[in-house]
C-alpha cells in the first residue's frame, strides 16, 4: 500500500491534530463547568455552556478522524520499501 501524503506532511498533520484534540477537550471541559471567563462572551447569544461543550466535542471527533488517518499514513510510509532503480 502506498501512502497518500508525504511522511513529513503526515507527521505534521498528526501532531497538529493531537494538539487540536487536547485544546478542544480542555475548552469543552471549561464550557461544561461554565467557567466565568468564557461564559461572559455567550451573554445575549442564547447559547449555554453545555451546548458549546457539545460542539467542541463534535470538533474533537473530526480531529480524531484526521489523527487516525494521518497516523496511519505515518505507519504506512515507515514500512514502505524504498524504490530501487
UniProtKB/Swiss-Prot annotation:
Membrane-topology annotation of the record: Multi-pass membrane protein
Top-rank taxon: Eukaryota
GO annotation, biological process: vacuolar acidification; vacuolar transport
GO CC term (a single one): vacuolar proton-transporting V-type ATPase, V0 domain
Residue intervals passing through the bilayer: 13-33, 56-76
Protein localization: Endoplasmic reticulum membrane
A Pfam family recorded for this sequence: V-ATPase_su_f
Keywords of this entry: Endoplasmic reticulum, Membrane, Transmembrane, Transmembrane helix
GO MF annotation list: RNA endonuclease activity
Endoplasmic reticulum among keywords: yes
Primary residence: endoplasmic reticulum
Record-given protein name: V-type proton ATPase subunit f
Protein's organism: Schizosaccharomyces pombe (strain 972 / ATCC 24843)
Upper taxonomic lineage: Eukaryota, Fungi, Dikarya, Ascomycota, Taphrinomycotina
Amino acid at each position: 500500500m502506498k501512502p497518500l501524503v508525504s511522511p513529513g506532511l503526515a507527521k505534521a498533520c498528526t501532531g497538529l491534530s493531537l494538539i487540536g484534540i487536547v485544546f478542544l477537550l480542555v475548552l469543552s471541559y471549561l464550557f461544561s463547568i461554565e467557567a466565568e471567563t468564557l461564559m461572559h462572551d455567550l451573554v445575549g447569544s442564547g447559547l449555554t455552556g453545555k451546548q458549546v461543550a457539545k460542539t467542541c466535542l463534535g470538533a474533537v471527533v473530526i480531529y480524531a478522524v484526521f489523527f487516525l488517518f494521518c497516523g496511519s499514513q505515518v505507519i504506512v510510509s515507515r514500512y514502505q520499501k524504498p524504490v530501487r532503480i
